[in-house]
Structure formats: structure tokens, C-alpha cells
């Protein structure tokens, strides 16, 4: 279920800052037509930190409604207060989602034991599979492989999204967590190499604007056709890099607007629109990738 090219989906807003649910439906249809293997709703790329609880739950529910069982829907439920993640998990238990993705608590820098207890508390109240999410570049805390292994022993913790970019961890996690534990890359630039080393796929930002290419690349990779996959990867590499020229999702939201995938590139403060000096850089990356 959790493999291939999974999109960390944008949350489209209208010019007045309200969520654009018609735009959300359009994005869902774009991804299904392109062969995307799954959707993460309201993760980091979906601007989870600036949505209200009510908006968060509604975006997830609407995504489930629009997808209508055609591909898996994963709900972002991360927070830096355990009770908040627990609340999201309870609210979404009957939503029809296929899994939850929960980022490590950010800013307050818990210990490894704190991280273990945080995820254990979430797992105990959720009735869907849980995906751990480690992105120390954003959270200032690193979920160490030994802690991942402890968590993998819990019944409904089934996967890890690893956005460290450290490819050595693929083999370490596989050895510690076993063959059945799902390993997903959270780093587009190293995602293909991650799968070459034994991962099952990627949760991707690039997928937002190059969905078919990403789906094709990871289909080829999972079939063991790495040379063909690498041709696509090299063409997309300018996107993998330049979609992070400013904090994500700023560049990818601008790019999606240029491609007509969303009508408005509005972001909620403290995120602001892509700096004008970066426009030609991202535009050139899209041109080099063959999507613009």
C-alpha cells in the first residue's frame, strides 16, 4: 500500500486566504491521472502549521472524499504537543484515511525517550497505520535508528519517512526494523538512491508539479530498472534542488501556479510568496525538467 511516488500535497488557498476546496479536488484528479501512488494531506508541504484544527480535519476529509478509494490517503497529524497529535488521530479515526504521518515534535527538542513515548501515545489511540517522520533540518531533533527500532515493535507503527538525506540509514533501519517495516524517503534529491538501497518509495515535493515523471521513475525503480529511472531522475534534479531554494512549500506553490495546477499561490504568514529574484531560477528548473 505505501510505496512508489507519494505526493506531499499542497493545500491551495483562495486570494482571501481561505482553503480552495475546488482547487484541492483539481489537484487530486491531476495526481490520480498521472499515476501518483498516494497522497499526504496536510503535511509540511500542505502548510499544516497554519491551518486551524477545523480546517486541518476538513482538508483531510475532503481529500478522502475526492480520492474515493482510488489511491491511499495519508493524513498529516504531527504536532509538538503530544496531546494535539493524539487529538488529530482521534478526530480522524473514522475519516477513511489509510495511514497517518506524524513528524517528530519540533522546537521543544525531546529526548529519545520522549520521542518514543510521544509516538507510543499516538499509536495507542489510532486505529490506522502510523508513519514516523524524521526531518531534523526542520525540527531540531533527530529520531535515531535505535528509537525507530523500538517503535517498529508497536503493532500499528509500520513505516518511516526519512528526510535526513543520510543514505547510510537505509541499511541501518532495515537491519534494526526488519524486512516488513516500510522505509520511505523524504528527500527528493536522494529518493531514487534510497530505493536502490532497499527503500520502498518517496513522499515527495517534486511530485506536486511533475507527478507523471515521478510516478514513472519510482515504478521503474521498484521493478529494478534503475538505469531507466536514473534518466528521469537526472532530468528532474534541477527541480529536486531548486524547489528548496526558499523554504518549502514556497517555491513549489509558485511553480504550481505557473503551471496552472492551482489558481492562486497564496501562502499563510509567516510564509510569504517566492522572492522575485528566485522566479527565473525555479522557472529554468521547470524548463530543464521538461515540464514548463
Swiss-Prot record:
Enzyme active site: 133 (proton donor/acceptor), 161 (schiff-base intermediate with substrate)
Broad class of where this protein is predominantly found: cytoplasm
Gene Ontology biological process terms from the UniProt entry: diaminopimelate biosynthetic process; lysine biosynthetic process via diaminopimelate
Presence of keyword Amino-acid biosynthesis: yes
Keyword Cytoplasm included in the entry's annotation? yes
Q: Identify the residue position(s) of the site Part of a proton relay during catalysis.
A: 44, 107
**Annotated Pfam families:** DHDPS (PF00701)
Protein EC? 4.3.3.7
- Catalytic reaction list: L-aspartate 4-semialdehyde + pyruvate = (2S,4S)-4-hydroxy-2,3,4,5-tetrahydrodipicolinate + H2O + H(+)
Going by the UniProt record, its keywords in alphabetical order are: Amino-acid biosynthesis, Cytoplasm, Diaminopimelate biosynthesis, Lyase, Lysine biosynthesis, Schiff base
Q: Which residues form the signal peptide?
A: none
Q: Gene3D superfamilies from the xrefs? A: Aldolase class I
Location(s), subcellular: Cytoplasm
Binding sites annotated in the UniProt record for pyruvate? 45, 203
Query: What is the annotated quaternary arrangement, including any partners?
Result: Homotetramer; dimer of dimers.
Q: Which family does it belong to?
A: Belongs to the DapA family.
Q: What is this protein called?
A: 4-hydroxy-tetrahydrodipicolinate synthase
Species of the source: Vibrio vulnificus (strain YJ016)
Name of the gene this protein is made from: dapA
Amino acid at each position: 500500500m505505501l510505496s512508489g511516488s507519494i505526493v506531499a500535497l499542497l493545500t491551495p488557498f483562495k486570494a482571501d486566504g481561505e482553503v480552495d476546496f475546488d482547487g484541492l479536488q483539481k489537484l487530486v484528479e491531476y495526481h490520480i491521472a498521472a499515476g501518483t501512488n498516494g497522497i499526504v494531506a496536510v503535511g509540511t508541504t500542505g502548510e499544516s502549521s497554519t491551518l486551524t484544527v477545523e480546517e486541518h480535519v476538513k482538508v483531510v476529509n475532503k481529500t478522502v472524499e475526492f480520492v474515493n478509494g482510488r489511491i491511499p490517503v495519508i493524513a498529516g497529524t504531527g504536532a509538538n504537543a503530544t496531546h494535539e497529535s493524539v487529538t488529530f488521530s482521534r478526530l480522524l479515526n473514522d475519516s477513511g484515511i489509510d495511514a497517518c504521518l506524524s513528524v517528530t515534535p519540533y522546537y521543544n527538542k525531546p529526548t529519545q525517550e520522549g520521542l518514543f513515548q510521544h509516538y507510543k501515545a499516538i499509536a495507542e489511540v489510532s486505529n490506522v497505520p502510523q508513519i514516523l517522520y524524521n526531518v531534523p533540518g526542520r525540527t531540531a531533533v533527530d529520531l535515531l535508528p535505535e528509537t525507530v527500532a523500538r517503535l517498529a515493535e508497536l503493532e500499528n507503527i509500520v513505516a518511516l519517512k526519512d528526510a535526513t538525506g543520510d543514505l547510510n540509514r537505509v541499511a541501518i533501519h532495515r537491519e534494526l526494523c526488519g524486512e516488513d517495516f516500510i522505509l520511505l524517503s523524504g528527500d527528493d534529491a536522494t529518493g531514487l538512491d534510497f530505493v536502490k538501497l532497499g527503500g520502498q518509495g518517496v513522499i515527495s515535493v517534486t511530485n506536486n508539479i511533475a507527478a507523471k515523471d515521478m510516478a514513472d521513475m519510482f515504478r521503474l525503480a521498484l521493478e529494478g530498472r534503475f538505469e531507466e529511472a536514473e534518466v528521469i531522475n537526472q532530468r528532474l534534479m534541477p527541480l529536486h534542488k531548486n524547489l528548496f531554494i526558499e523554504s518549502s512549500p514556497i517555491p513549489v506553490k509558485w511553480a504550481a501556479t505557473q503551471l496552472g495546477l492551482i489558481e492562486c499561490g497564496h501562502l499563510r504568514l509567516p510564509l510569504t510568496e517566492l522572492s522575485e529574484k528566485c522566479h527565473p531560477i525555479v522557472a529554468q528548473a521547470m524548463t530543464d525538467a521538461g515540464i514548463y
